[in-house]
């Protein structure tokens, strides 16, 4: 695969004091590869979770939970994102190993109607409530 190329890129970035972050599926093999490549940070792809409903979404949520826990045990900084919005962010925000959520599209879409300050404030409230409860 691409491990040699990714490792080389991670090394070049590290030489410039830049932390590489790899966007990966919530999968143990990809987490192992991220460690092998020398990436200190990963962003777990939450798109499949965001696209699903019902039981299938719960199964995918568990994949994200398990991946976040495993990646944290490996020493990685765990972020998550893609497809997260006001109605599905809470379950992901509750995962304690996740340091940062990358949410953009839904906030900007909401901002068209409610203004950016209101859109950001509401998303922040949802994340804060999920993390404190």
Q: Can you say where each PLM-predicted feature lies in the sequence?
A:
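Histidine/lysine/aspartate-rich catalytic loop segments that bind and position anionic ligands
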Residues: 18-74
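C-terminal active-site rim and adjoining tail of enzyme catalytic domains
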Residues: 77-86, 102-105, 127
């Amino acid at each position: 695969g691409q491990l040699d190329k990714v490792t080389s890129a991670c090394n070049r970035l590290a030489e410039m004091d830049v932390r590489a972050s790899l966007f990966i599926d919530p999968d143990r093999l990809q987490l192992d590869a991220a460690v092998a490549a020398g990436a200190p940070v990963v962003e777990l792809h939450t798109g499949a979770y965001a696209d699903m409903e019902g039981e299938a979404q719960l199964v995918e949520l568990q994949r994200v939970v398990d991946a976040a826990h495993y990646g944290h045990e490996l020493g990685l900084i765990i972020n998550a994102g893609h497809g997260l919005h006001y109605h599905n962010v809470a379950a992901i925000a509750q995962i304690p190993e996740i340091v940062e959520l990358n949410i953009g599209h839904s906030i900007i879409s909401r901002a068209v109607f409610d203004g950016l300050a209101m859109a950001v404030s509401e998303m922040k409230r949802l994340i804060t409530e999920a993390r404190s409860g």
